[in-house]
Design a protein with these regions (language model features):
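Conserved beta-strand->loop/alpha-helix structural units within folded catalytic cores of enzymes
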Residues: 411-421
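A short amphipathic helical element positioned immediately N-terminal to and/or at the very start
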Residues: 405-410
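Membrane-anchoring alpha-helices and their flanking helix-loop junctions
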Residues: 2-404, 420-482
Length: 482
């Protein structure tokens, strides 16, 4: 589901395998399938990986601007919540009147060493769970250099252990359940510092000790490479995948812990808990638990298969996700909003409907992958398009593109379920303030941009096969509209 975050999957790559192991289907023995081939003309760089940029000053300026503005946006939102009752307008007017430098000097969050140590302990704890909890080894997709990597997918166990310890410690009086909310400003400093350090470390590791040299991408610009990343799958040892750990452990597990802490904070300062904060948190939990139950699915998303590990993913997963995806509970903890039974039921129904759509779409993809396209979708044989692509080692592989079921309605219909669920999460906060709706607005922009990236990547990867697919499935996200 994103993003940065919980990204929505790149679900077009349903199956990838070496063609020498695939029987010839061109004689029509597989009903309703066609084969489209694609050959690359580049020897030094496979065209369907991340694009090579040549370090123009414009790219460098853009990366520097994003790496500067994004942390400031996080700080700006915290100031709006803690100093101006969540009003973005009042916060902006005050900043314009005081000047940005004086405004930040007076209102910016302050960190402390105790919180830094606590955050370091959190990272260490999650690293121990990642490494030592029982796990199955799941396969990702072939990288552009031809590597098929195994991943430790024990995220659900890590989520359960973490939340069980949090709840037990809170119930036994060993831990203040509102501890995260009460130390939120210092935590924002800690996560930002770590996000920048992590980005720098990933940059240096890619130069000094790369895991898979063939899957690195260099642009010629230090800033662009720092932002977008160089290594595709940086690792320590055989199975400690740096990208999967940071994308899928500390930040996303913290998401629901932060929600619970702000629920406790609302109770401590107001004396009651509203149905709106419970509803928003329930939808978050549904989202996160589903992510971990289907963690092997995440290995086939654009985050793992396409994006290299730089500031975009490192800082985004460690800072943007836990700070901006929890805005609804942050806002409701200090601005309690009670929903009528009808409103609560409507929002709940919409949110669950979005989730069911998202899960149904993913199920169809997984079914086609497991059966190699020989399955029934909506009572009819699956309509699949078989396409080929090459990896950097020169081997040709086959993938399946679904053209029926949900995937016959739109090429990215999975994003529609994402958006319905995202807007439902924000709707629990009411319509009096724009701030808690930031998540839905961000997801809309992110998913549309991701569509463009996905379309470009698949076009390069599959060539004429992708053109044929687009002719069969004309709509992008919303059938009949876009």
């Amino acid at each position: 589901m994103e993003s940065i975050i919980l990204p929505s999957p790149d679900l077009h790559d349903v199956i990838g395998k070496n063609l020498q192991d695939v029987p010839d289907k061109s004689n029509g023995t597989l009903n309703r399938s066609r084969l489209a081939s694609f050959s690359t003309t580049r020897d030094s760089s496979i065209s369907w990986g991340r694009r090579h940029h040549h370090g123009s000053w414009l790219h460098s300026l853009g990366c520097a601007s994003i790496m500067t503005l994004c942390p400031l946006i996080v700080i700006f939102y915290w100031i709006a919540l803690s100093r101006f009752d969540g009003s973005l307008t009042s916060t902006y007017k005050t900043m314009a009147m005081m000047g940005p430098v004086n405004f930040l000097w007076q209102h910016a969050p302050r960190g402390n060493m105790r919180t830094n140590v606590g955050y370091g302990a959190w990272l260490l704890f999650q690293g121990i769970l990642y490494q030592f909890l029982p796990t199955k080894l799941s396969s990702g997709q072939l990288t552009p250099a031809g590597h098929l990597l195994k991943y430790r997918t024990n995220g659900l166990s890590a989520w359960i252990v973490t939340h069980a310890l949090f709840l037990i410690s809170s119930c036994c009086g060993l831990l203040d359940p509102a501890i995260l909310a009460k130390h939120w400003q210092a935590l924002l400093i800690s996560v930002n510092v770590y996000g920048f350090l992590l980005s720098g470390f990933a940059y240096l590791k890619a130069h000094l000790s790369p895991t898979h040299e063939g899957d690195r991408k260099f642009s010629g610009s230090i800033l662009y490479d720092l932002y977008m990343g160089i290594e595709l799958n940086p690792r320590f040892g055989k199975y400690f995948d740096f990208k999967l750990f940071h994308n899928g452990r500390p930040g996303i597990i913290a998401w629901t812990l932060i929600d619970m802490s702000f629920i406790a904070y609302q109770y401590q300062i107001h004396g009651y808990i509203t149905n709106s904060i419970l509803l928003s948190t329930f939808l978050h939990i549904l989202y996160v638990v589903d992510f971990f139950i289907n963690e092997d699915w995440y290995l086939r998303t654009i985050d793992i298969c396409h994006d290299h590990f730089g500031f975009y993913l490192a800082w985004g997963s460690m800072v943007w996700l836990p700070s901006m995806y929890t805005l609804q509970t942050q806002y409701l903890s200090i601005n309690p909003h009670s929903l009528s039974p009808l409103a609560a039921m409507t929002i709940f129904a919409l949110g669950v409907s979005g989730y069911v759509l998202f899960r149904s779409v993913n199920h169809q993809k997984d079914l086609a992958r497991r059966t190699k396209g020989k399955c029934q979708l909506w009572g009819a044989p699956a309509d699949v398009l078989r396409v080929t692509y090459r990896t950097k080692d020169g081997k040709e592989h086959e993938s399946i593109l679904l053209c029926s079921g949900w995937w016959g309605l739109a090429r990215h219909v999975n994003y529609l379920g994402d958006l319905i669920l995202s807007y439902s999460m924000c709707a629990a906060c009411g319509t009096n303030n724009l701030l808690p709706w930031t998540y839905a607005i961000f997801m809309t922009i992110l998913l549309i941009h991701r569509c463009w990236r996905d379309e470009e990547r698949c076009s390069k990867k599959y060539g004429k096969g992708w053109e044929t697919y687009c002719q069969k499935v004309k709509w992008v996200i919303v059938p009949g509209i876009y």
